[in-house]
């Protein structure tokens, strides 16, 4: 096939034909005289395409003289250069563009091109381009090529060469060339064809196919033609009572007008025999006169354009027709957004009805016909073609009744009608029926077939995407044939509509929360035990709690709604995947995610935190309870962030002093409150401030609490502990635990030991006895994967009181810092007492790895403190004061009372905000000393209390040797607790579940084993919730040597500094709660003093109760 893009070299053409100048080179117009030699025209040159004005026409001045097939013509036919629209640049002329740009430009182009005298005015003659003609339209070209298209007249050739010599580059077949005379004859025939369709109009001439009937002229003529009476030539008068015969039509017309019409001036009624008006009078005489033309066939109004033989019975029709020559389209579509213009109002109405409305008011009322059309012209056409020329359509045919079901064949009807109709009908539109069906364009299909598929008429809406083509209003529909679904027009309009539609759809389909963050929402789904942030979260609705980006990532609930990662998809990238987060936030998120995932002690490894004891931890505190609370508050979580804990992000910090996480255990959770899964690594040690891991843990716990019945600390009777951050439900939450705590009031020091249910929230602050399934036992060295649940050794101050698993006790064994679970019984408290995470949250040592985490909802269980940081691994695991049996009702009550008291004191201390000052000392002694022995020597109490509390300090220093290494977290927690106590002083101490037994009497000056009360544990900062080591089962009181395990508050105060993370992390401010003031140690000292003063009594009470 000829490559239109490659212009044939001039020389190549010279052989068969005379050399032709390039399109830029003007060629003298070819006249008959200009041609010499045998006049042969290559038909392909004459018509590259039957419907295009293309070079074929340009090159074809066959009527003027024969031209050999010229490659130029072929090239011009195929290639369109980006030349100006100048009428002279035929090769590059884009008819549609020209028409759209200026209807007149096309006319000018045609006029300039049409130099042949062969008969067309301003355009090729009717027959020249008409596809309806039996011969190719290109042969009808009569114009000599204009200079721009000029084809040099073929020079004299040898006849041998002059014959059709297919040019090697010529594209298309080389039919036998027609002599000029033959062409002239054909052209004459074409002109003689009674094509009332405006084939004579440039729009209709052969352009129809390229334009797909988009030119207005065609439709106008079609309409006119329909309106025009049949080409009748009547010479006999059929007026009632008159039978005169005349020699000519003119005589008959004169007779009628003078004798019948003017003779009956009072009544304007047609008495012509068989008139469809049935004697219905007209309103005016001129109307009757015009009507009579229908009977006589008179068409006095003739087109004045050269070569146009059109004539009309009505002047208005002639005017409309003339617009086809001039390109004028004064009638604009009134539909909003539709830019189509028409040369006559009827065409516009037709377009509007077809494309912008499904209504088909024009019904064929002939018997047995149910066809309906959108416009009268289509109806007339239908009647004329289907029912015959004698069946006249009148206004009576317009149906007002309900639209009958449009027969599906209606779409096919146009074609059939065209086929059955006169040649002019066919000549009008040669567009395939298929192309026309979808489009209601009257021009494309027979106008009568407005029944084009309903989609055609309705679908062609500007707003809708019309695959069919020029939807109504499409700019492509250049011609009045608005319906004419020009293929090109269709493509353009369709493309436009598609583009618009795509845009709309894109806006509508825009995915929510496509931040690209892969972190799964950390939110916990109610009581679901799973804390993991990963896929389990996907099941959860994305909310601040469920959203991985939400509170867990310190992102507001709003952001959680747009969680970048699917709720169920684990945030593989962790917080780091959140591009918008600050490093601290990323770290926090990672820690939380890690703890939630149980991935490890590191923030990222804490992912296992989400499932403690192999079971997903339900949030310990309901989000509802702590709407403003965000376990990650200490972390960079915004106050607007959901209060829910970041799903089991590893509470890398030691339990917070006031964190009831160790104590708070959903009473209803049988090991489900929070999974103290030894495998859930708590990012206890995580470099991020304990607040992050702690908060994460607390968030996770809070989430777990939430689903659990009675999970809320309040529900569990831990209301007094409500102030304690639930995130540290394990008691190691970390300074941020306060943030995690429902009560933002907690300062960093008020971190719950575990991410377990907020000590203040959910069921018991202390782990509920046997409420949680036994988490996988973990060695103290190994922190449960649910590190988020249990502060790592670092979080616990590096020491985790090793308490027998809560499973052993049937209840969570609460380490002192962890505080006793407020749950069912002292056993629940025992974990709190026993669970004394070491101060260093960095070590995600499963605090309760040894405990059946699930057995009680131990907030202090290893879930929060999955693995104490190695640095803070308890130098010596302190036996947690596990309440082996729920029978310690009295002792537990006492312990609980003491814990409550201690918690209150710790709250005071926390409120003092000196927790951060507490050195990260003695994370080793996680035993109740921290909690029970929360009595810190005033000097120590005065020592800066680490706001993060033991095990919560972002940097849990190794436990100070001065204090029990393991309890140091306790001390720290205590100090933190003191800060929190002070902080919580404002908030009444949570009522921890009665500690089964408080560790020995608290010694003010010495390191008294902190009460199993989670508050104490939190205050102590030690892993109050840490369960005793797997094998260790001890009564919290028994296992706790209260005398020996005296809290060295000075050491605690000193130690929390290293252990406690910055108060900012722990503060609830981010969670919307007032973070416990993380003031200097001296602040905590005041609280500590109060605590110390109260501790002796508490200790004695505990001892007596023990």
Curated annotation (Swiss-Prot):
The lineage of its organism: Eukaryota, Metazoa, Chordata, Craniata, Vertebrata. The keyword Zinc applies. InterPro entries: GLI-like, Znf-C2H2_ZIC1-5/GLI1-3-like, Znf_C2H2_sf, Znf_C2H2_type. Keywords: Acetylation, Activator, Cytoplasm, Developmental protein, Differentiation, Disease variant, DNA-binding, Isopeptide bond, Metal-binding, Nucleus, Phosphoprotein, Proto-oncogene, Repeat, Transcription, Transcription regulation, Ubl conjugation, Zinc, Zinc-finger. The keyword Metal-binding applies. Residues 413-428 have a biased composition (Basic and acidic residues). SUPFAM superfamilies: beta-beta-alpha zinc fingers. Residues 754-766 have a biased composition (Pro residues). There is a cross-link at residue 1003 (Glycyl lysine isopeptide (Lys-Gly) (interchain with G-Cter in SUMO2)). This is Zinc finger protein GLI1. Residues 1-20 are annotated as: SNAG domain.
């Amino acid at each position: 096939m000829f490559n239109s893009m490659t212009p044939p070299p001039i020389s190549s053409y010279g052989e068969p034909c005379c050399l032709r100048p390039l399109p830029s080179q003007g060629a003298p117009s070819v006249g008959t005289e200009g041609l010499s030699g045998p006049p042969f025209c290559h038909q392909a040159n004459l018509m590259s395409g039957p419907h295009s004005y293309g070079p074929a026409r340009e090159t074809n001045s066959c009527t003027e003289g024969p031209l050999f097939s010229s490659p130029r013509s072929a090239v011009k036919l195929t290639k369109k250069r980006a030349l100006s629209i100048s009428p002279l640049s035929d090769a590059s002329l884009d008819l549609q563009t020209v028409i759209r740009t200026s209807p007149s430009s096309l006319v000018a182009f045609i006029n300039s091109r049409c130099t042949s005298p062969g008969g067309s005015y301003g355009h090729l003659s009717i027959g020249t381009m008409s596809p309806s003609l039996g011969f190719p339209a290109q042969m009808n070209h009569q114009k000599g090529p204009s200079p721009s298209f000029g084809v040099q007249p073929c020079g004299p050739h040898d006849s041998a060469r002059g014959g059709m010599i297919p040019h090697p580059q010529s594209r298309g077949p080389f039919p036998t060339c027609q002599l000029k005379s033959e062409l002239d004859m054909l052209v004459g025939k074409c002109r003689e064809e009674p094509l009332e369709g405006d084939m004579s109009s440039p729009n209709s001439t052969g352009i129809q196919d390229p334009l797909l009937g988009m030119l207005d002229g065609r439709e106008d003529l079609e309409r006119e033609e329909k309106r025009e009476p049949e080409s009748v030539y009547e010479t006999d008068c059929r007026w009632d009572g008159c039978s005169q015969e005349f020699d000519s039509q003119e005589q008959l017309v004169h007779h009628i007008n003078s004798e019948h019409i003017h003779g009956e001036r009072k009544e304007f009624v047609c008495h012509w025999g068989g008139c469809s008006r049935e004697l219905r009078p007209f309103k005016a005489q001129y109307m009757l006169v015009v009507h009579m033309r229908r009977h006589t066939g008179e068409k006095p109004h003739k087109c004045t354009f050269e070569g146009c033989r059109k004539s009309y019975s009505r002047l208005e029709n002639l005017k409309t027709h003339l617009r086809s020559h001039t390109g004028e389209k004064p009638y604009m579509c009134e539909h909003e957004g539709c830019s189509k213009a028409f040369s006559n109002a009827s065409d516009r109405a037709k377009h509007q009805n077809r494309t912008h409305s499904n209504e088909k008011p024009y019904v064929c009322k002939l018997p047995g016909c149910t066809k309906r059309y959108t416009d009268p012209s289509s109806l007339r056409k239908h009647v004329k073609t289907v029912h015959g020329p004698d069946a006249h359509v009148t206004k009576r045919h317009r149906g007002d009744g309900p639209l009958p079901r449009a027969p599906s064949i209606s779409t096919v009807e146009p074609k059939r009608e065209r086929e059955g109709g006169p040649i002019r009908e066919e000549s009008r539109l040669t567009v395939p029926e298929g192309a026309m069906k979808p489009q209601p364009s009257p021009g494309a299909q027979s106008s009568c077939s407005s029944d084009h598929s309903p989609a055609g008429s309705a679908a062609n809406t500007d707003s809708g995407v019309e695959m069919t083509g020029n939807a109504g209003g499409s700019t492509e529909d250049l011609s009045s044939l608005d319906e004419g679904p020009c293929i090109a027009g269709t493509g353009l309009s369709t493309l436009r509509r598609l583009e618009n539609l795509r845009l709309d759809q894109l806006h509508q389909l825009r995915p929510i929360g496509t931040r690209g963050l892969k972190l799964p929402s950390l939110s916990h789904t109610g009581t679901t035990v799973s804390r993991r942030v990963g896929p389990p979260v996907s099941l959860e609705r994305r909310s601040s709690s469920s959203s991985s980006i939400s509170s867990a990532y310190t992102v507001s609930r709003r952001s959680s709604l747009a969680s970048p990662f699917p709720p169920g998809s684990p945030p593989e990238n962790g917080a780091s995947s959140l591009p918008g987060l600050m490093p601290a936030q990323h770290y926090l998120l990672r820690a939380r995610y890690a703890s939630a995932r149980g991935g490890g002690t590191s923030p990222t490894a804490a992912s296992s935190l989400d499932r403690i004891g192999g079971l997903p931890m339900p949030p310990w505190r309901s989000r509802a309870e702590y709407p403003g609370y965000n376990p990650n508050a200490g972390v960079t979580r915004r106050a607007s962030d959901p209060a829910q804990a970041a799903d089991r992000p590893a509470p890398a910090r030691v339990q917070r002093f006031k964190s009831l996480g160790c104590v708070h255990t959903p009473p209803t959770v049988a090991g489900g409150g929070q999974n103290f899964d030894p495998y859930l690594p708590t990012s206890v040690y995580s470099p991020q401030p304990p607040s992050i891991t702690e908060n994460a843990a607390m968030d996770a716990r809070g989430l777990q609490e939430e689903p659990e019945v009675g999970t809320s600390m309040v529900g569990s009777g831990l209301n007094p502990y409500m102030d304690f951050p639930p995130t540290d439900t394990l008691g190691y939450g970390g300074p941020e635990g306060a943030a995690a705590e429902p009560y933002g009031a907690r300062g960093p020091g008020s971190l719950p030991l575990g991410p377990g249910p907020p000590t203040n929230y959910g069921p018991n602050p202390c782990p509920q006895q046997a409420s949680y399934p036994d988490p996988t036992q973990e060695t103290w060295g190994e922190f449960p994967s649910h590190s988020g649940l249990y502060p790592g050794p670092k979080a616990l101050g590096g020491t985790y009181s090793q308490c027998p698993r809560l499973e052993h006790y049937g209840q969570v064994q609460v380490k002192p810092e962890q505080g006793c679970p407020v749950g069912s019984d002292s056993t629940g408290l025992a974990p709190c007492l026993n669970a004394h995470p070491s101060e260093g949250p960095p070590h995600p040592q499963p605090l309760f790895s040894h405990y059946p985490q699930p057995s009680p909802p131990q907030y202090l269980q290893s879930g929060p403190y999955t693995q104490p940081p190695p640095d803070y691994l308890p130098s010596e695991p302190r036996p947690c004061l596990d309440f082996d049996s729920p029978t310690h009702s009295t002792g537990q009550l006492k312990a609980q009372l003491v814990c409550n008291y201690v918690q209150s004191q710790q709250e005071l201390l926390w409120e003092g905000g000196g927790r951060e000052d507490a050195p990260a000392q003695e994370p080793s002694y996680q035993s109740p000393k921290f909690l029970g022995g929360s009595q810190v020597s005033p000097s120590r109490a005065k020592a800066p209390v680490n706001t993060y509390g033991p095990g919560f300090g972002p940097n849990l220093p190794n436990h100070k040797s001065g204090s029990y290494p393991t309890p140091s977290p306790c001390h720290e927690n205590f100090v933190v607790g003191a800060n929190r106590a002070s902080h919580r002083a404002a908030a009444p101490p949570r009522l921890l579940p009665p500690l089964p037994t408080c560790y020995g009497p608290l010694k003010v000056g010495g390191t008294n084993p902190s009460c199993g009360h989670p508050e104490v544990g939190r205050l102590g900062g030690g892993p109050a919730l840490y369960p005793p080591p797997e094998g260790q089962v001890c009564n919290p009181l028994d296992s706790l040597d209260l005398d020996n395990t005296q809290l060295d508050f000075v050491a605690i105060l000193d130690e929390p500094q290293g252990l406690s993370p910055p108060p900012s992390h722990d503060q609830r401010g981010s969670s919307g709660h007032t973070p416990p003031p993380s003031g200097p140690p001296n602040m905590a000292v005041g609280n500590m003093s109060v605590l110390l003063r109260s501790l002796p009594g508490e200790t004695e009470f505990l001892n007596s109760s023990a």
